[in-house]
């Protein structure tokens, strides 16, 4: 299997492939990109053909099945409680990890939290708390992808080269230890990520101050976030 293969033209966006073989001559090939503009079907098929030929030496192939979609990649807050008896879940409930688009493990953890809330409180409105550390890291990576997309591929290459896969998977699943997080952060290009981290912190502090001021004027506190959507 191939995980996040960046050997494809980035063209001003973050683009990579996944390859999951089922047999010697059959595989699932997924093309992922973080962008504001959706590709046409022709552009997607051309990128797939170019990748298979230049990276894997496959000039002729047949597509057996295909699917596509677009996910919201943003760190903006999602309203979860939509009424007295309605709780947003899944994509609508902001269960997609902002910086990667991964959702399966987050949905499972959220489902467990909903069950615990029902058993303990008689309602589902005590969901799993969002780890502030991961949300800040998501915001940093989103800012890097938006402002320095060409630097993402070498940064991820360094991260994969300097960390065991088990640590990376724990990090992506938001199950990492403090040492895991520090090790991964240390493996990334310091000038870019430290600078972006400081910019992100300043932006969040500034947005929070404006939100508190609006809250005083309107009698409520408004959440604020910056991000990029796909």
Residue ranges and their predicted role:
Residues 7-13, 35-113:
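FAD/FMN-dependent oxidoreductases across multiple families
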Residues 27-29, 36-37:
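Conserved anion/nucleotide-ligand pocket segment
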Residues 112-230:
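C-terminal helical "tail/cap" subdomain of flavin- and related membrane-associated enzymes
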């Amino acid at each position: 299997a191939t995980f996040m293969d960046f050997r494809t033209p980035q063209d001003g966006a973050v683009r990579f492939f996944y390859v999951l073989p089922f047999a010697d001559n059959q595989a699932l090939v997924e093309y992922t990109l973080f962008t504001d503009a959706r590709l046409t079907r022709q552009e997607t098929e051309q990128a797939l053909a170019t990748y298979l030929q230049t990276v894997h030496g496959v000039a002729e192939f047949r597509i057996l099945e295909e699917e596509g979609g677009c996910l919201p990649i943003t760190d903006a807050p999602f309203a979860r409680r939509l009424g007295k008896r309605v709780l947003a879940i899944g994509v609508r409930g902001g269960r997609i990890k902002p910086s990667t688009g991964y959702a399966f493990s987050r949905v499972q953890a959220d489902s467990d939290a909903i069950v615990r809330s029902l058993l303990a409180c008689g309602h589902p409105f005590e969901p799993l708390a969002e780890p502030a550390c991961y949300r800040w890291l998501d915001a940093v990576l989103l800012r890097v992808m938006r402002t320095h997309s060409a630097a993402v591929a070498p940064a991820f290459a360094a991260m994969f080269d300097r960390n065991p896969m088990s640590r990376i998977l724990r990090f992506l699943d938001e199950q990492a230890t403090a040492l895991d997080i520090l090790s991964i952060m240390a493996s990334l290009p310091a000038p870019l990520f430290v600078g972006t981290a400081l910019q992100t912190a300043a932006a969040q502090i500034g947005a929070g101050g404006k939100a508190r001021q609006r809250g005083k004027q309107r009698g409520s506190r408004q959440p604020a976030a910056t991000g990029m959507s796909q």
